[in-house]
Regions:
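A short, well-structured edge-of-sheet supersecondary motif
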Residues: 2-35, 65, 238
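Structured C-terminal helix/loop/strand segments within mature extracytoplasmic catalytic/sensor domains
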Residues: 1-9, 29, 165-186, 191, ...
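Mid-domain, small-residue-enriched loop/turn segments at the edges of structured enzyme/sensor domains
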Residues: 14-17, 110-169
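Short, glycine/proline-biased beta-turn/loop segments that scaffold the active-site neighborhood
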Residues: 58-84
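Conserved catalytic neighborhood of penicillin-recognizing serine enzymes
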Residues: 74-109, 147
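Active-site SXXK
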Residues: 39-67, 236
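A short glycine/serine-rich beta->alpha loop
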Residues: 32-39, 85, 143-144, 248
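Short glycine/serine- and small hydrophobic-enriched flexible loop segments
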Residues: 50-58, 101, 156-163, 263-270
Length: 276
């Protein structure tokens, strides 16, 4: 039974569409609906970060430069800046980190103001992510979309970072360092054995770490990132759409089927000692 057949069996009762792309960096991929378009939700924050790192690499910006939280960029939703006072000044790196690890929407809007929508989209084209587009800043009262991508496109930046070719080795390392601090990775980790991530009581090294970025809106629940294992690393993206339940809660069906797919792919990879 192929890995794709096993994934289809898991998703048999899923009331929606799931797109998957996984790359083991040995010429093997797992792909389903990999070129279908999906809403990005906060996954678009990964190309925004990549654009920032390109500007830093080109010395157009410095990560130590200060930015200010402006009142007109206030937006509800994820993040912590909405609980703080406008006028707060932080470094560009701090804003970028908040944008990724707690998916801060205000920090994201500040980053979009800094970089510009067009520059982010130019970066996507430069990276070969031709189906990926940032449509606008985050404003739930004005826009129903934030961005679009495909599972295969979304994997590109993770693949580049893993290989050290996201602008440079240093920029790739910084990208991974930031994404490893991610607070929200339910889709990728919910079904995995906790021991993989926390072996403090045994003295053993932790078996698994992940650098990832998720994204959720009414119409989608997405995640993607790099899995680092004792056998090496692989990239996995899981995007969903078309389900009828728009509510946000831990037992949403996307967080039932998506994590099972992630677990299956990890166990398949480990059983083949670093291959798909």
């Amino acid at each position: 039974m192929t890995i794709e057949s096993r994934i289809n069996a898991i998703n048999y009762n899923f009331n929606g569409t799931m797109g998957i792309y996984a790359n083991d960096f040995h010429g093997n991929v797992i792909a389903m609906n990999e070129e279908a378009l999906f809403e990005t939700a906060s996954c678009i924050k990964v190309p925004i970060l990549a654009t920032l790192l390109k500007e830093v690499k080109q010395k157009n910006l410095s990560l130590e430069e200060k930015m200010t939280y402006h009142q007109d960029n206030f937006i509800d939703g994820s993040g912590i800046l909405r609980a703080l006072t406008p006028g707060l000044s932080l470094s560009i790196l701090d804003f970028a980190t908040l944008m990724i690890i707690v998916s801060d929407n205000i920090a994201t809007n500040e980053m979009i103001d800094l970089l510009g929508v067009d520059r982010v989209n130019e970066t996507c084209e430069e990276l070969g992510m031709h189906a990926t587009k940032l449509h606008n800043k985050i404003d739930f009262s004005k826009y129903s979309q934030l961005g679009t991508t495909t599972p295969k496109d979304y994997a590109v930046i993770f693949e580049r970072a893993y290989k050290g070719t996201l602008w440079s080795e240093d920029m790739s390392k910084l990208f991974i360092e930031i994404l490893k601090k991610q607070h929200y990775n339910t889709m990728l980790t919910k079904a995995l054995t906790p021991y993989y991530f926390d072996a403090e009581d045994t003295g053993d090294e932790e078996m698994l770490s992940i650098a990832s970025k998720s994204g959720s809106m009414d119409a989608c629940r997405n995640d993607g990132g790099i899995f680092f294992t004792p056998y090496g690393g692989y990239v996995l993206t899981i995007l969903t759409k078309g389900f009828s339940d728009k509510l946000f809660y831990p037992e949403h069906e996307t967080y039932k089927y998506g994590p099972q797919v992630s677990k299956l792919i990890l166990e398949h990879y480990l059983s083949k000692e670093g291959r798909f």
